[in-house]
Amino acid sequence: MIDLSIAQIADIVGGRLADITPDQAAETRVTGTVEFDSRAVTPGGLFLALPGARSDGHDFAAAAVCAGAVAVLAARPVGVPAIVVAPEPAVDSAASVLEHDTDGSGAAVLAALARLAAAVSAELVDGGLTIVGITGSSGKTSTKDLLAAVLAPLGEVVAPPGSFNNELGHPWTVLRATESTDYLVLEMSARHPGNIAELASIAPPSIAVVLNVGTAHLGEFGSREAIAATKAELPQAVPSSGVVILNVDDTAVAAMADQTAARVVRVGRTAGADVWAGPVTLDALARPRFTMHAAESQIDIALAVHGDHQVSNSLCAAAVALECGASMEQVAHALAAAGPVSKHRMQVATRGDGVTVINDAYNANPDSMQAGLKALVWMAREGGEKRRSWAILGEMAELGDDAISEHDRIGRLAVRLDVSRLIVVGTGRSMSAMHHGAVMEGSWGSESTMVANADAALALLRAELEAGDVVLVKASNAAGLGALADALVAEDVRR
């Protein structure tokens, strides 16, 4: 974060000082990071007192100061130097972050954090910072990681870790930027209409990327049209001096060209796009190879990430980098070196016994499930002798009334793609629908097996996995299959 005094921060967020005099607040500067976990506090930092599932950050204020924080942003006095903001009602857009906020204290601290991030981002933009916003139903984190890699040769980049893209992660990431930051890459998610507009108001992007409109969070939005309208809030937030990158292979995204005042750059797999990919091939590990065309130039691209779906992600990242002044050669080199960064997102590891594990267990929706299954069967059949393919699938959350039909569809798809073994993890109605769909599509014997939990799935794999098999582990994060995938990578086959 930029260097600010406690008094300046109090003025920005509209808070009052507690347990510190005005003179002390004017003299004491926040030179460290802003943290909501007292264990992560750095010397000179600012601690956010937020309510959590098991504890309230206000109870850890003293520990944070002992760890080096110079002040706490809180909703009540905490016995150590603090900026206190008045509690306020939690709003729907913050519900996912503040589900344990019973008195409005968390909503107040979060709103103050947003005001601080907005002030800091405005000052940094005046100093030359370029802000890039990314949204889409799937692929945001992978694209964010690719974009951070291709921008790195051009200057200092700040991007969120993992999928830290909500009402807390967004301003927290903004406050990671300093005067030396050239590019701030922000991933923007939404659970309700207005979420993306709210995030964009904190750090208005001069470059926006819209990847796709799918069915993630369909339960919250009710329709794909409502999802598209919310994703369109990002290009709508870009000024006429900015640039909007649209993946025109998705018709709902292509239609957003009429909803922005900014210049539009179209990317896709057809020659009519501004940045486009020629014929795509995949190697034995499903890593795409293609020729990228842009501005009457072309260059061969060999990606280090896995899956055909990464083509559009990489094109969007490339388009941003080209807009920022990168050469085609710089983009190609950076993409070739940019492997998976964020944990449990298409991480591919091959063990000593030849078993390949595709760990994509952080998140899942119907579109990303389909992409994962296609990558699985490709890896199993390429590179010589056909290998057995295993799909270890958990629940896709937040699909609302479509949950049963979408899980049924994925079970049927696994059979149509000729996945050798489908292990359905979980006992709810959605998981029963996935197993039933596979059986009705033509699965026989033990091709589709339903188990109660991740431990049961791991026990089955330990008993039946053979050298050379290929295993996809995928589910929404709440299913907890990431630990299963980690365990598979770490151990030998047990017969």
Name what the model sees in each region.
Residues 1-18, 40-46, 56-62, 81, ...:
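ATP-dependent carboxylate-amine ligase
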Residues 1-133, 143, 149, 451-463:
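Short, basic phosphate-binding NTP loop
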Residues 9, 45, 64, 116, ...:
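Residue-level signal for inorganic ion chemistry
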Residues 33-35, 67-75, 243-247, 263-267, ...:
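Short, hydrophobic beta-strand segments that form beta-sheet elements in well-ordered domains
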Residues 70-71, 182, 206, 420:
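Short acidic/polar active-site loop segments enriched in Thr and Asp
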Residues 98-248, 252-260, 463, 472, ...:
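Phosphate-binding loop of NTP-binding sites
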Residues 155-162, 268-269, 445-449:
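Conserved RecA-like helicase motor-core motifs
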Residues 177-180, 190-218, 254-298, 337-349:
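Extended acidic/charged loop-beta regions that coordinate divalent cations
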